Amino acid sequence: MTACVSFETDPAKIPDPVKPRELATEPVVARPATSTTTGTTTSTTTDSAPQTAVIATHSGRASEQGAESPNPVRTPAQVTRVGGDTKAQIEIRDGEFRFGPSRIESPLPAGYPEPTPPGAIDLKKYPAVRRAEYASSGSPGIGMSMGFFPLFNHIKRNDIAMTSPVEMDYRGLFDPATGVQAKQDSMSWTMSFLYRTSALAPVGKDGSVVVTDRPALEVLSIGMNGAYGTGVVEKGLGLLHGWLAEHPNYEIAGEPRAFHYNGPYIANRVKWSEVQLPVRLKL
């Protein structure tokens, strides 16, 4: 049997959250005709010279028109459903990934696989990604607040649009054999904001924030609903370890991480996250 978990997805029972549109952008000069396609913007000039269509790949700059809402895409080549709720399916509606009342309002990094719906278990292949990291030790619950503002100020200073998810990497916090929270003091964590493309800023240090490239990797992932924190991570890891026990041809290849897709204004019951373990086939 495969590990399974159920979540409330009845929109009549869970309020459908709405994100306040607060992200300000710099003024954009109006043009007579502008059309947008997936990942590109076409505009026509109005001077006396012959009109020229200009195609520009979206850079991900916060001041660029449409920076906060590039079109989401399905990525079946990067995702394989292997357990949990095998019938759960996400949809793309109104420019957002959705599952029941849960939604993802911000764009994913370019090339990232689609999100795993709550209750489903997927094998997923992630490309390399450039990210801004804030690392510390101690309580990751406190760290989620402590790390957010240095990271937010970093992307604000560099005019980089917010993406989703916010990533939490955990070291020494969970028993590698069971996924249960370990009873020890030597725990540390890293919170990361992910760049949509690596062209946005170079690697290096910006105060307490480090910009670095994370290599490509394969993970076993379960989608979750619920308040963000170590409790939902522990629950998800227990289910992933259950799947691994039934599939001994895979082994754990790294520390666990969590993807947080929503901001604090979203009701806890419909917050969308993923709990992931890097894995590989045994030789």
Predicted regions and their residues:
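A solvent-exposed interaction/effector surface
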Residues: T2-L283
